Amino acid sequence: MARVGFIGLGNMGGGMAANLAKKGHDVRAFDLSAEALERARAAGCLPVVTAAEAAEGAEAIITMLPAGTHVEQVYAQSVLDAALPSAILIDCSTIDVATAKRVAEMAAAKGLVAVDAPVSGGIAAANAGTLTFMVGGSKDAFRRAEPF
């Protein structure tokens, strides 16, 4: 299975990261909340100290953050510099279209591939692993994101 960097372990991200770990992925999980990190550890994820540490060496980097400003900030300050050139960036946050496009452009400027992949289904579906993803990006980016 793959190494996955997961950034944002709140109500939705915590369940999503746990399900990736259950599927056998090596999940490096980051959140500002110590409680969220402990829940991730209990679910089989490896808690890390920074977003950059979550991104380092990951085949896929998934963000699930509260707002577009958070996504832009974590990409600019951590993800884009730490990501492997071959990594797929998957933002599952519910953010506005303009921000999603800016984030994708930021990734492309660094030679990285990104998809916008907000979800539907709520906390119960995140915990059950039954979320519906609405993915925007190139066909190649979609193909690379699909296993995650």
Region spans (language model):
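Rossmann-fold NAD(P) dinucleotide-binding segment
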Residues: 51-113
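NAD(P)+-binding Rossmann beta1-loop-alpha1 motif at the extreme N-terminus of oxidoreductases
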Residues: 1-62, 123
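Rossmann-fold dinucleotide-binding core
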Residues: 4, 9, 94-148
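Acidic, glycine-centered active-site loop in nucleotide-sugar glycosyltransferases
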Residues: 42-44, 77, 84-86, 127-130
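Active-site-adjacent beta-strand anchor residues
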Residues: 30, 64, 93, 135-136
